[in-house]
Amino acid sequence: FKLGSFLKKAWKSKLAKKLRAKGKEMLKDYAKGLLEGGSEEVPGQ
């Protein structure tokens, strides 16, 4: 049993695709919030 091959199979599964899509959306929203909220707090921007 190799963990690497198991992770690859899990990563390619449909569930993983949904999770990755959700993760990307969450990262985008998080980055957007950081940029919008951070620009007010950081002086000189």
Swiss-Prot record:
MF terms (GO), sorted A to Z: toxin activity
Keywords: Antibiotic, Antimicrobial, Cytolysis, Fungicide, Hemolysis, Ion transport, Membrane, Secreted, Target cell membrane, Target membrane, Toxin, Transmembrane, Transport
Single GO cellular component term: extracellular region
Gene Ontology biological-process entries: defense response to bacterium; defense response to fungus; killing of cells of another organism; monoatomic ion transport
Compartments where located: Secreted; Target cell membrane
Tissue expression profile of the protein: Expressed by the venom gland.
Its biological purpose: At high concentrations, acts as a pore former in cellular membranes and causes the leakage of the cells. At submicromolar concentrations, degranulates granulocytes and has a weak hemolytic activity against human red blood cells. Also strongly inhibits the production of superoxide anions. Has a strong antibacterial activity against Gram-negative bacteria but is less active against Gram-positive bacteria. Also has antifungal activity. Induces reversible G-protein dependent Ca(2+) release from intracellular stores and increase Ca(2+) influx in HL-60 cells.
Entry's family note: Belongs to the non-disulfide-bridged peptide (NDBP) superfamily. Long chain multifunctional peptide (group 2) family.
Assembly mode: Monomer and homodimer.
Protein name from the UniProt record: Parabutoporin
Organism of origin: Parabuthus schlechteri (Scorpion)
Lineage: Eukaryota, Metazoa, Ecdysozoa, Arthropoda, Chelicerata
